[in-house]
Swiss-Prot record:
<feature type="repeat" description="ANK 4">
    <location>
        <begin position="192"/>
        <end position="223"/>
    </location>
</feature>
<feature type="repeat" description="ANK 3">
    <location>
        <begin position="159"/>
        <end position="188"/>
    </location>
</feature>
<protein>
    <recommendedName>
        <fullName>Putative ankyrin repeat protein L86</fullName>
    </recommendedName>
</protein>
<feature type="repeat" description="ANK 1">
    <location>
        <begin position="68"/>
        <end position="101"/>
    </location>
</feature>
<feature type="repeat" description="ANK 5">
    <location>
        <begin position="227"/>
        <end position="260"/>
    </location>
</feature>
<dbReference type="Pfam" id="PF00023">
    <property type="entry name" value="Ank"/>
</dbReference>
<feature type="repeat" description="ANK 6">
    <location>
        <begin position="264"/>
        <end position="300"/>
    </location>
</feature>
<keyword id="KW-0040">ANK repeat</keyword>
<keyword id="KW-0677">Repeat</keyword>
<feature type="repeat" description="ANK 2">
    <location>
        <begin position="118"/>
        <end position="147"/>
    </location>
</feature>
<feature type="repeat" description="ANK 11">
    <location>
        <begin position="448"/>
        <end position="480"/>
    </location>
</feature>
<dbReference type="Pfam" id="PF12796">
    <property type="entry name" value="Ank_2"/>
</dbReference>
<dbReference type="InterPro" id="IPR002110">
    <property type="entry name" value="Ankyrin_rpt"/>
</dbReference>
<feature type="repeat" description="ANK 7">
    <location>
        <begin position="304"/>
        <end position="337"/>
    </location>
</feature>
<feature type="repeat" description="ANK 8">
    <location>
        <begin position="341"/>
        <end position="373"/>
    </location>
</feature>
<dbReference type="InterPro" id="IPR036770">
    <property type="entry name" value="Ankyrin_rpt-contain_sf"/>
</dbReference>
<feature type="repeat" description="ANK 9">
    <location>
        <begin position="377"/>
        <end position="408"/>
    </location>
</feature>
Length: 576
């Protein structure tokens, strides 16, 4: 027998319980009863009457199970559209076939029929109709519509939602409605805690119509699975699906709670930020509006201390990030909420050099946020200004103008200027250093007694000399021991030279003072010349008559009084 025909009963000309026979379109095994063999050959032999005769004589075969646990009823139910007939299904039920016996995979005849409808795209209209009639017949004869297999999956959701996916795709709610009309519990959960509604929202592109249907059958919109995830969370997680916005609105209007938290503390709104579907930014924005409109609390934190505002700060798309943050702030999000590290959303924005932030956006944010909040390490937002960011000089300037404290100290006593001198490496950072120096107290020291200048000295980048120069020009002083570092040696030499020059200048000034004191003493020749000249110019002959000219005439070499006057005038012309 070829592989192509291995599931075709036509190739099996005689019965043997040890032979392998097909029992459905993709299954085959041994240990068939003669009744099972006759069922798969019914349409070939036109053998319904043969089955009746055999069953009358062999009723003990009615619930016999083959090697895979399938009964004659299971085989007849799933092949009633192509190998046997629905009349045979009814015949078996009338003769005591048990519709609730499970096969070795934990599936009953009804579950197998419903599962066959997942291949609805492969079926013709009459085949689909036949399966629906078979399902209804099994229910009429006591099939348990709430039966759960070994994985806890019920008839409706045991295929992990694929049943519903196919049914919805082909606009066929008939089997779902049949089950619900016959008291199927829509809130039964499987071993993972997922209900029918969970599976719908996980596996389907469109959920609106099935949600509307289930709302008529007391479905629990807030049912949680073992991870405490709700249906609303899954819809938000897969918000990129085309109709999820409408489905979310439908759930919220009918009482879905947006503030339930899963085992990690995440709410439905937080799931909007788990994946970055940039092309669906409008969907995300509209869903956030809906959730807030129906009472979502934007300030709930998950187990990691993250709120939706903190999550929004990680959105990569700048336009989307800005608009969502603005919307959240306008609608009650706490601007100063912090994560477990004490970081605010503004700190997270500023510290990432990839985030482009305009002055307009920062001015808007500063209406709400306190920039002087410190994280768990004692840092304020200025400590997080990054290196090499295009926007950071403008952002830094605006923050400094907004009275953000430039002298705030972290847990190691370091100021923003100290950290900047330590970590900045780009020539673009020199502008930021200048700004921080302008607003900061540069003489502050950390817990180890280090100043910003010390941090600049230990910076090994190309801008070290610029930073050191800026600090020295601002008035800082270099006070370290000579090291092997050439710059340290140079600065120390400059410092020692500066000290020597200061001492030299002091010495010269003292020499000048003492020299003037000596030159201008009353008994000096210089003083006497100036005194006599002053008397002559002012015609004070009385004082002049009292002067002793002998020493002066001898010093100047004058022969008489008139000659003395001439020599005095000549000497005065050369005095400074």
């Amino acid at each position: 027998m070829s592989e192509k025909n291995s599931f075709n009963p036509e190739g099996f000309s005689y019965y043997d319980c040890n032979r392998i026979f097909p029992y459905c379109h993709n299954g085959k095994c041994k240990n068939f009863s003669k009744l099972m063999y006759l069922i798969i050959k019914e349409r070939i032999y036109n053998g319904h009457s043969i089955i009746i005769d055999h069953l009358n004589q062999n009723k003990n075969e009615i619930n016999h199970q083959n090697e895979h646990g399938w009964t004659a009823l299971m085989i007849a139910s799933v092949t009633s559209s192509y190998w046997c007939t629905i009349d045979t299904v009814k015949l078996l039920l009338e003769n005591g076939a048990d519709p609730n016996i499970p096969n070795y995979k934990g599936e009953t005849a009804l579950g197998l029929v419903v599962g066959s409808l997942t291949r609805i795209n492969c079926l013709e209209i009459n085949q689909r109709t036949n399966f629906l009639k078979t399902a209804q017949l099994l229910i009429e004869y006591g099939a348990n519509v709430n039966f759960q297999n070994d994985f806890g999956d019920s008839i409706l959701n045991h295929s992990g939602g694929f049943i519903l996916n196919s049914s919805l795709q082909y606009n066929n709610f008939d089997i779902i409605k049949i089950l619900l009309d016959n008291n199927t519990n829509p809130n039964i959960s499987n071993n993972k805690g997922n209900t029918l509604l969970h599976n719908i929202c996980i596996y389907n592109q469109s959920c609106d119509d099935i949600i509307k249907l289930l709302l008529n059958y007391n479905v629990d919109l807030n049912s949680i699975n073992l991870k405490r995830k709700t249906v609303l969370m899954y819809l938000c997680k897969f918000y990129n699906k085309t109709n999820n916005v409408n489905s979310i609105k439908l759930l919220l209007k009918n009482g879905a709670n947006p503030n339930i938290q899963n085992t990690k503390g995440n709410t439905a709104m937080m799931y909007l930020f788990n994946k970055f579907y940039h092309e669906y930014g409008d969907n995300k924005y509209n869903i956030i509006k809906l959730l807030l409109q129906y009472g979502a609390n934007p300030n709930i934190k998950n187990n990691s201390g993250i709120s939706v505002l903190l999550r929004a700060s990680t959105i990569q798309n700048g336009w989307e990030r800005k608009n969502i943050i603005k919307f959240l702030l306008k609608h009650g999000a706490d601007p100063n909420i912090t994560n477990n590290q004490g970081l605010t959303f503004l700190m997270l924005l500023v510290k990432n050099p990839q985030n482009h932030m305009t002055k307009e956006f920062l001015n808007f944010v500063l209406k709400y946020v306190d920039p002087n909040i410190k994280c768990n390490k004692g840092k304020n937002i200025l400590h997080y200004i990054p290196s090499e960011s295009i926007d950071s000089p403008d952002i830094l300037k605006r923050l400094l103008e907004f009275t953000t404290n430039p002298n705030a100290r972290d847990y190691k006593g370091r100021t923003p200027l100290m950290l900047a001198c330590k970590k900045f490496t780009s020539t673009n950072d020199i502008v930021k250093i200048n700004l921080l120096v302008e607003y900061s107290v540069i003489s502050l020291t950390d817990n180890n007694g280090k100043k910003a200048l010390d941090y600049a000295m230990n910076n090994t980048s190309n801008i070290r000399l610029f930073m050191v120069s800026i600090l020295l020009e601002k008035g800082d002083t270099f006070d370290v021991n000579i090291k092997n570092d050439p710059l340290s040696k140079c600065l120390n030499f400059v410092k020692q030279s500066s000290i020597a020059k200061q001492k030299y200048d002091i010495m010269l000034s003292k020499i000048n003072i003492e020299a003037n004191k000596f030159i201008l003493r009353p008994s000096s020749i210089r003083t006497k010349i100036l005194t006599v000249n002053w008397y002559i110019e002012h015609h004070n002959f009385e004082k002049l008559a009292l002067c002793d000219y002998s020493q002066l005439m001898e010093y100047l070499g004058a022969t008489d009084i008139d000659d003395l006057k001439l020599r005095i005038m000549e000497n005065i012309n050369y005095m400074d």
